[in-house]
């Protein structure tokens, strides 16, 4: 039996022992060394050859990733590691660090209980470090820290042992400051990265060595020894004395929780059902014999097997051939194959139990974030939806070059939307174009070139990228009458800005899109009040949609309950297109204050009520001082001081705002905010301005009001592009 086959047998055995399972992820800012670290962990565990680790990038098994040298999708792998005489099963997920692929990070966080946050010793804490940490802590995923590229501090920056320790302490202090700010209240102190007890490791993933304070005490290696090894270019010997996989995996097993421990505090955070129900108790206890409950965290498309769903099980067990139920899409499915992940391969197993991550085939209609349960015991409600820190900010129109490819193109686009819920796919009914919205230029490029072109074999024409704008209101409208086409039904409403704290809660994922069937649920009401909505209104919310809400403030109108679903549909249609440029509306609260209906139900059907509400909402928004909002990005530039002026000039030329500047040695760090509309071609321009000597990164930072003097011009450009008549 080969080494790999033995590993599979061990994995099958360990899957049943919760205390010896760790579901963990590796996350970081782009190019801080996540995938190199993952590969060396795999090599140490005997999954790939040691000679190739570091260059092989086993988890970058997509051609596009290997070509770009960055991780685009989150890859999964199971492996075994021995610690203190016991074997442990490690389910490892390597996540992308590039801001355009943040959706994969969000989805991976739902599957794992602990994370190794990788931070480059040279660059320190960067924007994406903060973002991935925020996402981890929001999902109650416990972090430990690995400071990578330490050899560069010694060989390139020539730091002394004292300076080395100073640099480490600065990075650790910054990470701990973020943990204290963002961790759940009960873990703010407990989850801090403490060097002394081994929650921090230092090393070089590329050169395959790592060290932690407990390991230094055990092995007798000091910082001075490390400097000597690096200066003498003898890092191979250092890797034998302090192997990376041993130090990092020991740290992970000791400090990251097993599923039994983690699910006790994670389940109440991601599932808002009855904690005292059988399934509620079973999930908290991670019971393999309880009712089935799991969540799909990723969809991978395999040329031979079709759609494969990566799934984290919180309760129960899945066997091959089991009937399943998908809560979100309300569909039944069957588990055709049950497997574990081994990088690009999947190994079939007879069954998978609670606390593990598995691969399922047969879930055709599943999307990322879907709740999986048994048809005989349906999980109500499903798991909380996955909320992302970024939103799609760029749209392109695509058309198949050959019309016979159209049906296939539509199928691929459907598949992409299922795989990646940060992508929006729409069909422009008038032009027949398909519109794809994504997180940035690279995200869109990977979808059009790789997913459609390379994998789908379809040649497409891709239009110029278009920025996604939003509309909101600055004032309150008068009372507006919405009248049905037959003039027999009238609804009266007022549009006003949503409370800032309520909208902020929506953006943070504490509130989400929801229709309330009769009245606000008790849980929904409590969340709304906590977010800052008046109790009187919180009871009467009819629907929250795309960051807008409608509240029923009428009294004693009998027919209103019958028309409730139609009113909600009319409200949704009303906020899909704003009055200025037919862009989506956000941050608007519609108060329904009165209504009169025809007594005969036949005269108050969908064709009457939906248009009445839709026109009423649009009119109310149009009379409440509407304004355009544009997406913004935080831009961080790290450049030698000689080029600081050029870097600042580049930001200022793009309507940017310098927010902060820091000096570190002979480097300057510029923090700024720039509209996405001005960021096209930035990569080439900033490299030119600093002669290629800068590091830079961007991150979505929300929507801001377009300056007054540009509002009419941008609104006209959007209207012209959409073929709408000019206002």
From Swiss-Prot:
Residue sites binding GTP per the record: 28-35, 94-98, 148-151
Subcellular location, record wording: Cytoplasm
A Pfam family recorded for this sequence: EFG_C
GO function term, MF aspect, one: translation elongation factor activity
Keyword line: Cytoplasm, Elongation factor, GTP-binding, Nucleotide-binding, Protein biosynthesis
Cellular component GO terms, alphabetical: cytosol; ribonucleoprotein complex
Domain tr-type G, chain residue ranges per copy: 19-260
Stored SMART domains: EFG_C, EFG_IV
InterPro entries assigned to the protein according to its UniProt record, in alphabetical order: EF-G-like_DII (IPR053905), EFG_II (IPR041095), EFG_III/V (IPR035647), EFG_V-like (IPR000640), G_TR_CS (IPR031157), P-loop_NTPase (IPR027417), Ribosomal_Su5_D2-typ_SF (IPR020568), Ribsml_uS5_D2-typ_fold_subgr (IPR014721)
Record PTM Diphthamide, positions in chain: 603
UniProt keyword annotation of Transmembrane present: no
Membership in a protein family: Belongs to the TRAFAC class translation factor GTPase superfamily. Classic translation factor GTPase family. EF-G/EF-2 subfamily.
Database matches in HAMAP family: EF_G_EF_2_A
NCBIfam families: aEF-2 (TIGR00490), small_GTP (TIGR00231)
Role: Catalyzes the GTP-dependent ribosomal translocation step during translation elongation. During this step, the ribosome changes from the pre-translocational (PRE) to the post-translocational (POST) state as the newly formed A-site-bound peptidyl-tRNA and P-site-bound deacylated tRNA move to the P and E sites, respectively. Catalyzes the coordinated movement of the two tRNA molecules, the mRNA and conformational changes in the ribosome.
Protein's name according to its UniProt entry: Elongation factor 2
Originating gene: fusA
